[in-house]
């Protein structure tokens, strides 16, 4: 053990008098109260990077404070510009640790967290913070972001402290600080000092793996990552003099003995309620609200089932009660519910609470614990918790934490423990995460609870892992693990909370749970194993960090400047990389400082052209119009447009007299006795796009389609308009509505209220080409009014035989071919005629008995039939209106007589409509889908007009525009996906051309960033919003129940369903919530629609009309600064023969083959800019080729074909196969070695698929792209020339028959279908990277290990495992895979 240090960081006499009075007197030196191991750890930390691995409560923070005092002279202002950083994993720890440092040092401490808006601070703001800040306490993400933005430099930090350093793993912010900044600088030749590293943790293992053999490996990994060595003590006994250790005990509970019958009854009850409420949602909600509500009810159901099995009926009921609180408008999954959904969720929870309460016995909980457990009121585990707590009733000043796994468990245990009268003297609180949600708690709530716990006002806290680390919780005399620890770290930290003398740490374990007992023993031994392994590794130096991006090393070549110095003449020439806008710099001067002089001049020239900032840093943000500063929300709420052709004032519409008519014919549907069509009458002509048009109805029967044809104008008087209006209102209300009152109110609403403005058009049934006025006149009359006596007969009937109905006597002719409703069960029926049966006829029952119809209705419905001799009506359920645009396979329904035949007494029926033909019912059931498609087509025509005359000149079919605006979520016969793929490639192609031409001094990296900003989803979304494009997007599946019936466009409260949008002169039906990416996809799909039907000019002008500031020059001129002959460097003739193209400017071919490492005098540019251009050209060429070659392929297949052909591996394979690798100019020995290694293999076969060119250096693929760019420029931007030449190199091309699926995707799909678990593990041993793929399939584990770059090795390993799995599972599905 080392002796105490002498200097604690005090300042000297000189140079500090001006600031000395501003500082308070220094606090007492904490070393005077430090323990021996703390002083020993401090000495180790001063000498080198150290990780202090000590128990919770052993004073690790004090070691950090002493280290800060030791480093005070290095960070104190104004003598030093460096500072110390204290990193903590959670926000709550920022203020906590900052206060500790302030109490024990005289350093200026500043604290930072995300709530301060630090994400939006610029370099100037951070500089102002560092003016006087000496110790900065913050979360690690803030430091990582600042390092990435170069606001901080690692060398400016003198001391870097990591609290809870076990979080340094994977890609956490702790780990990224080391991987991205510390280790690169550690391995570089830079002389800048690195900060001293000090880490603190109570557990070095943060893993679920309890295998003791892996402890050494994990400790070594964290040491290597943090470049530090672990300091710890020999055993717990070395600390026991200073730290009280809890007595760990295992408390057993029995298995649940609740009867299986009771459990089954309760579970059945939950399932029934869940099904009931989900079915209710289908009738009341739609779209995103419906899915949202269904998901939440399903999640709640799983939560209640969890509580039932693990906690008992009482707590399951309590969980339902908590969720039913009205103020709890947020689900505990953290997503805000819309107003329509909140009520359904609360109703569901309330009903679950009522039903579960029925299973609870009367009486106070806890009066008879064994009986409660026996009856399932509480599980044995909960009973064990209560029994255990009651054993500590004698304890004075109880401080207890009960650790649970789930938030809901902590919430419901609080009222349970509070309600037990034996615990009435104890105050119980729960604590869970501060995320938004169920009974959400803020950090202020947490602080108040902990403070009450400290003062003894709260005795028991039921907490999730939030109390394992972070908050400064007082020492406890009792800690109970209700749920087992998930990791070693969790176990050690929760045990560390029991730090009082004679404290207990209790583990609740099932009596027969062997695994839990084994884990508990391993947990107990883990601390000592970690100490022993840490001490054993103490003499082993830290190893360099493994390179996790090893695949890049195969082709990455570091560009270094080259100096040509002539000491005799005093001149120096600096050669910069070929990608630099300045490539050579010449100076004359004094020999001893020639390098410095030429570098200064190079900086001046680079700064002059904007390649360096004023701070002489690379300019990564090029200020230009092409890089807008865009922030777009993930979801955008926009109005959904409605066509103005369908909107008018009903009063004025009925007086027009002249109406434009379109005949709508439904084809491919069942043949009826007298086929009918529909006549659509409108206020205006719809234009040339609707003179004659047709579209399919994939949701109907095979080959169902609609033809729409303009047939001229007709004259209608006001009475005829009213008759037609009544008819369509009645029949459509009946077909769409499923509630008698709803339909009746809708029909009455028509008569009672005149709509000032709304959806206005007429749908007139045709018979033999003529309007069926007879059917409309009588079937739309208000029969439902019982006092309408003149309607007891139809106009031509002489029959005096009246039948008694619910609304009085009616003639047989009225009842035949009518629509009736039976109020006793609220069901609609279509009446086709009369049966030779009456109330006394016999009705066979399912059980074999026979009753009369009179007895049946009396027994079943409590109805007495008084008109026994009336014939029964032959009824059937009416055809349901559904979404016939939905792209699902049509299944032929049974004939009504086979399935829906029913016998109805007339006296139980209320006539809704009569007469109504079966033909009219059938075709009008298609009307909502037909009119919605016409509505969308009208909007597509409107969009064509809105885009302006320059775009309108191109004849793009309306259905093609509609395809571009229809998302996959609509589930229709077409979607925008294929057009989006095509438009995306053209957008990249045009943007790349523009940037390549406009910014000739910028290298490929800057151009790529500019392109990304130009065509990012955020940029495209902003363009769409600015162009008022979003309202045209068809983003949700059509729901016929939401379709507006002409005339009935007010809701039940009298609110309009159609509104006028003054800013853009459009009408809106509703508001929709749409993701910004979906909007961007629609822009790309529109570009694809214009490209595929009208060509490149049309697509480009569309992009311009949307506001894209780009140009599309027919040629891109090439400038030459130096004249040279390409033949002196490459074999031009041989290459031209290989490519099938003769260059006009062979220097372009030379540039395309020149690697950035080639510093020999001659070529002035490397291939990077040409690669940037060629990449976009090839991507577009392949996409266009596959889109036109396979017009009927699915969007998924189009994407797979494109991916299989357009990737660097395929290009690299083609380059080697053709011998292009022999012509590449480079000066990198490393690249030469890698190429030689891989080129020793055989490269034949096709150049497509993921296996083509695997492992080849990236430069080989880059050359294919750069040559494509060179040919494109040389041929004056002729894509056909490029395609012919590149096709020679890349053939044979992928086809739908030859494409090979991605093995990672294939393995995932195979395992998902069987619920197999897949894991991937990366290894790096002796410089060789590998990936192990494992699949747990029942009792069998399949695994494969493959070496190589990470992505490639993962695919190879997946392929091998998938092959073994298929061989081991010889079923039909496996064979298909």
Swiss-Prot record:
Domain called Helicase ATP-binding: residue spans:
41-222
Q: Which cofactor does it need?
A: Mg(2+); Mn(2+)
Pfam families the UniProt entry points to: DEAD, Dicer_dimer, dsrm, Helicase_C, PAZ, Ribonuclease_3
The UniProt entry, under SUPFAM superfamilies, shows:
dsRNA-binding domain-like (SSF54768), P-loop containing nucleoside triphosphate hydrolases (SSF52540), PAZ domain (SSF101690), RNase III domain-like (SSF69065)
The family database entries (CDD domains) matched by this protein are listed as: DEXHc_dicer (cd18034), PAZ_CAF_like (cd02844), RIBOc (cd00593)
- Tell me which residues make up the Helicase C-terminal domain: 388-561
Describe the protein's quaternary organization and the partners it interacts with.
May interact with ARGONAUTE1 or PINHEAD through their common PAZ domains.
Spell out the protein name for this chain.
Endoribonuclease Dicer homolog 2b
Gene name of the encoded protein: DCL2B
